Regions:
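Extracytoplasmic substrate-binding proteins
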Residues: 56, 144-212, 303, 310-327
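Structured C-terminal subdomain patch of bacterial secreted/periplasmic proteins
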Residues: 263-327
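A short, structured surface patch at a secondary-structure boundary
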Residues: 65, 70-117, 125, 131
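Ligand-binding pocket segment of bilobal, Venus flytrap-like solute-binding proteins
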Residues: 198, 211-216, 234, 245-274
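Bacterial Sec-exported substrate-binding components of ABC uptake systems
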Residues: 2-13, 18-72, 177-209, 268-280, ...
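Short helix-initiation/N-cap motifs at beta->coil->alpha
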Residues: 52-54, 107-114, 243-252
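Alpha-helical, coiled-coil/dimerization segments enriched in small aliphatic residues
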Residues: 91-95, 218-248
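Proline-aspartate-enriched helix->loop->beta-strand connector
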Residues: 122-128, 144, 257, 261-266
């Protein structure tokens, strides 16, 4: 055999060995990639247990068809791009557009809900709470086997803890733990900033403006603002016996407000959240336009804080972060 032929034969063998080695490396790499993916998939939790107000609830993961009845969840879920199959659409704040679609079944208002529409949406998780809590037993009966959680703030628990708890739970359910942590951190930072900003002696009154009327929001128990008094250690300008948690505030005369002469006034504009654009008188116009209030310290010094317009139908941890940052 000639030397040239031997060389060509050796070259061919070497090329074949190299090709085989490359092929083997690719296969090995592919197998490693597949193994890594399988490992990642197998490490994902198949369920999570949530401490609902009614006890522990096991939820199979991933959740595919969510129905939420708790208006405190809508903004958080929308930020995380979590789709819903059913919700009380008229209770969704107008600032949230994600669920204003035909793909979301409308179960109506809490006064007369369409629970049949909820069941027909075939949810694999129901988030109840707040206005719909009283229907929990009926909802459970109509949706057998479907996990339902209620993360309504519990009586006697600090508001900050009860705002943080549902966000962390939702983060675990939908795999948004880092996003939940960010919301909690933002809230805690706002809370700490507001605590440092308060001088400890200025008097504060909270009011709820609805239908052009000014209602008294009681410290601790009143709507939205009540728990803020406890969180920040605010000094009430006036304490009314027999006060309630009425959604429009308790009856009070503007003369009583003027006599209390608060250094600060915190305002919830209920109509801004539930009325159509332009069909109501804004709370600021009601407050600023009242002759009996024009000389109180809060107004003369410009120390009036208005909650975001969608607060009454929102009240999520995001809303409270905005409120605290405005104080």
């Amino acid at each position: 055999m000639s030397r040239k032929l031997l060389s060509l034969t050796a070259l061919g063998a070497a090329s074949l060995m190299a090709l085989t080695a490359c092929s083997g490396g690719t296969a090995s790499s592919s197998q490693s990639s597949t193994s890594a993916a399988a490992s990642s998939s197998s490490s994902a939790p198949s369920s999570v247990t949530i401490e609902s107000d009614q006890g522990n609830v096991e939820i199979k993961l991933p959740v595919q068809r969510v129905a939420s009845l708790d208006n405190r969840t809508f903004e958080v879920l929308a930020q995380w791009n979590v789709p819903l199959v059913a919700a009380p659409k008229k209770l969704i704040p107008s600032t949230i557009k994600a669920y204003n679609t035909d793909s979301v079944a409308d179960i109506g208002m809490h006064r007369d809900p369409n629970l049949e529409a909820l069941a027909a949406s075939n949810p694999d998780l129901i988030i109840s709470g707040q206005r719909f809590t009283r229907f929990d037993s009926q909802i459970a009966e109509m949706n057998p086997g479907v996990p339902m959680i209620n993360l309504e703030p519990r009586d006697g628990k600090p508001l900050n803890e009860e705002l943080i708890r549902p966000v962390n739970d939702l983060g675990e359910i939908f795999g948004h733990q880092e996003d939940a942590k960010k919301l909690v951190d933002d809230f805690n930072n706002a809370l700490n900033r507001a605590k440092k900003a308060y001088d400890g002696k200025s008097t504060v009154m909270a009011v709820d403006v609805s239908g052009g009327n000014i209602g008294y929001v009681a410290p601790s128990k009143g709507r939205t603002w009540g728990p803020i008094f406890d969180l920040l250690g605010l000094k009430p300008a006036l304490e009314v016996q027999g006060s309630t948690d009425s959604h429009t505030g308790d009856d009070i005369s503007v003369e009583a407000i003027a006599q209390a002469n608060p250094d600060w006034i915190f305002v919830l504009d209920r109509d801004a959240a539930i009325s159509k654009d332009g069909s109501y008188t804004p709370a600021q116009s009601v407050i600023d336009g009242n002759a009996a209030l024009k000389n109180i310290t809060a107004l003369t010094k410009g120390q009036t804080v208005y909650a975001p317009n969608d607060t009454y139908t929102n009240e999520s941890i995001i809303t409270y972060t905005e409120i605290l940052n405005s104080i």
